[in-house]
C-alpha cells in the first residue's frame, strides 16, 4: 500500500488525488486549514500538523494553486524529511531527457519535450505544451493549453495563463 499525504483539500486537490490513485497510491489523506470547505476527505489535520504526520506518512505533496503558498509548504515538507514525489499522468508525454524536480504535478495530455528542466513544485496543467530546451523555474503554474516555445525561460513562481504563448 502506497501512502500519500496531500497538503491542501481545495478545488485542485481532487485532481491530484485522482492522479495519485492512477499512479498506485491507495492510502491518501489531506491536511487543510479550512476542513469545512474541503473538496476531499479524509482531512486528518491542518498544515500546523505537517511535522507530526511524518511518522505515519513518508511521502507528501502540495496541491495548492497559489505559487507562493505551494512553495512555502513544499519547503516545509522538505525540512520535515518527507519524500516528495513527481506525479505524471499516464497520458502525458515526458521526454527521457527532461529533468523533473520533486513536487511537480504533470496533468493529462501534457507534452514535455527534450532537454526541458522543471523546477520544484511546478504544475503543468491539462494540455500544456512545453517545447525543447525550456527552463521553467520552481513553483510555477502553467495553466491549461498554454504553450512554452523552444528555448524559453520561465522565471520562478510565474503563472502562465490558459492558452498563453511564452516565447
Give the location of each predicted region.
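A solvent-exposed beta-alpha-beta segment
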Residues: 1-58
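Short hydrophobic segments within beta-strands
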Residues: 6-7, 31, 63, 143, ...
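Generic structural signal for conserved hydrophobic packing positions in ordered secondary structure
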Residues: 8, 20, 60, 73, ...
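Small/polar loops that bind or transfer phosphate-bearing groups
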Residues: 8, 61-65, 114, 150
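Short alpha-helical
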Residues: 11-14, 68-69, 99
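Short amphipathic alpha-helical segments
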Residues: 17-20, 72-76, 118
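Phosphate-bearing ligand-interacting subdomains
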Residues: 35-93
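Structural signal for interior beta-strand "rungs" in well-ordered beta-sheet cores
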Residues: 86-167
Amino acid at each position: 500500500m502506497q501512502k500519500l499525504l496531500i497538503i491542501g483539500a481545495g478545488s485542485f486537490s481532487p485532481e491530484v488525488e485522482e492522479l495519485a490513485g492512477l499512479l498506485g497510491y491507495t492510502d491518501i489523506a489531506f491536511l487543510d486549514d479550512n476542513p469545512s470547505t474541503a473538496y476531499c476527505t479524509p482531512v486528518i489535520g491542518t498544515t500546523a500538523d505537517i511535522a507530526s504526520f511524518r511518522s505515519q506518512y513518508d511521502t507528501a505533496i502540495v496541491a495548492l494553486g497559489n505559487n507562493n503558498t505551494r512553495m512555502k509548504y513544499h519547503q516545509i515538507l522538505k525540512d520535515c524529511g518527507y519524500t516528495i514525489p513527481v506525479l505524471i499522468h499516464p497520458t502525458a508525454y515526458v521526454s527521457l531527457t527532461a529533468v523533473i524536480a520533486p513536487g511537480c504535478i504533470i496533468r493529462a495530455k501534457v507534452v514535455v519535450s527534450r532537454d526541458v528542466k522543471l523546477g520544484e513544485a511546478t504544475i503543468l496543467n491539462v494540455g500544456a505544451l512545453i517545447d525543447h530546451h525550456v527552463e521553467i523555474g520552481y513553483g510555477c503554474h502553467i495553466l491549461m493549453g498554454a504553450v512554452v516555445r523552444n528555448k524559453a525561460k520561465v522565471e520562478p513562481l510565474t503563472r502562465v495563463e490558459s492558452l498563453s504563448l511564452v516565447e
